């Protein structure tokens, strides 16, 4: 279990990542609070996952919407954000990435090398060639 301080830090890093992504895209973040999957993190429908360790994976959980793109954002110690890549939720849910390191909740840990280039994500959430995710 996380301490209240670690929880606060994780929440702040998440907000920094969401705002960094939105600034990079030139869009607005969602300002909805406690919607838990009902509303995407950003106006273009993306879910933002933040890391502070450059070697960490993008994590997708079983209750995450499968049709949304998930973007991995690295937040450094100066609150500078780097967009690392993205993947659709349903693409992330592969057995080879399923792990349960804490013994509480299995999740998919997608390696950075398996993410799509960030430049291929358009403002409306479509892949650059115009296709939509397959379900």
What are the functions of these language-model segments?
Residues 1-42, 49-135:
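Nucleic-acid endonuclease domains
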């Amino acid at each position: 279990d996380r301490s209240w301080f670690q929880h606060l830090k994780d929440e702040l890093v998440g907000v920094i990542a969401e705002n960094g992504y939105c600034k990079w895209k030139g869009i607005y973040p969602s300002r909805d609070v406690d919607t838990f999957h009902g509303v995407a993190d950003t106006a273009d429908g993306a879910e933002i996952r933040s890391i502070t360790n450059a070697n960490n994976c993008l994590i997708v959980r079983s209750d995450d919407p499968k049709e949304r793109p998930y973007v991995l954002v690295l937040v450094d110690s100066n609150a500078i954000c780097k967009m690392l890549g993205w993947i659709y939720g349903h693409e992330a849910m592969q057995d080879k990435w399923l792990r349960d390191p804490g013994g509480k909740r299995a999740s998919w840990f997608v390696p950075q090398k398996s993410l799509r280039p960030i430049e291929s994500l358009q403002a409306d959430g479509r892949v650059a060639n115009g296709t939509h995710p397959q379900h």
